[in-house]
Amino acid sequence: MTLLSVQNLRAYYQTRAYGISRTVRAVDGVSFDLFPNEIYGVAGESSCGKTTLIKVISGNIKPPLKVLEGSVNYTFGERKVDMLHISQDALRRDIRWKEISYVMQGSMSVLNPVRKVIKTFQDIVYTHEHITNKKRFLEKTREHINRLGLPTDVLNAYPHQLSGGMRQRVAIALATVFQPALIIADEPTTALDVVVQRGVLQMIKDIQAMSSNTVLLVTHDMAVHANVADRVMIMYAGRIAEEAPTESIFNAPLHPYTQHLISSLPVIGDRSTKASLKGTPPNLADPPSGCRFHPRCPYVMDVCRTVIPDLVLVKERHRVACHLIKENSL
């Protein structure tokens, strides 16, 4: 059973300024499934479509972003939810925080700088649960905080009184207060030092293990995916380049772009110079024809310049979009 099924999703930014129309193809024909009780990683360079993808699947679709094609369907137990056609009232009342929660890139995007942490918990809990007993609310909140290994005194602190790592942990605690089926974590370790990063990642892993929910982890840091993800999707220029179990992505990558990502990772004891990838990511308002990676690919063929490669299943749970794979020349 799938928790989330995304099929042929095309989400573009359509703008018009000074009489000039512009369409940015941020997500262009993306299809994938999420399953219960897994950590699914999404990786890729900046502006590859990662953030747009999670905006759509979380129901945060606002102009100039438009969904032109595709479907985003959830299964929460016996309940089916079509995310592209649900009303905003139903989304706010029944889905957000309770079934789908969002850990934003910056913890200060969630925490109000002039309100204590306990007030932010109160806003979320009171909105989604009919709690009239303040004592019961405090007990529930302290119990949740303690379960995640956080000291209860953070509840009476203002955000500026907490370290960056502690604020991020509080943001994760807020996102998991209702034990949602899906937690979307957007660059949860950005701007944190390595030691704090490890603590935040361990917290995410512990929450997933305790609640058996699904985590969609979005980050460009491949080391983070190696540490926590069960499966990884590699995006490039709005499309899926490769999707596979984490072990396969790191030990046997098939797409040339994935191969370069893995080869660029530092290895202890290796003093060799890492080769850089020539060129720059394409402009998604005017993407190249055919395979979008072909201007930078060392194995480019004529067909790559004209024909979009299909995302094909090459072995169990391993999909690749590359003409080289189809011709068995890698």
Segments the model singles out, each with a brief description of its role:
Residues M1-N251, V320, K326-L330:
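ABC transporter nucleotide-binding domains
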Residues K80, E243-L330:
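Short catalytic/signature loops enriched in Gly
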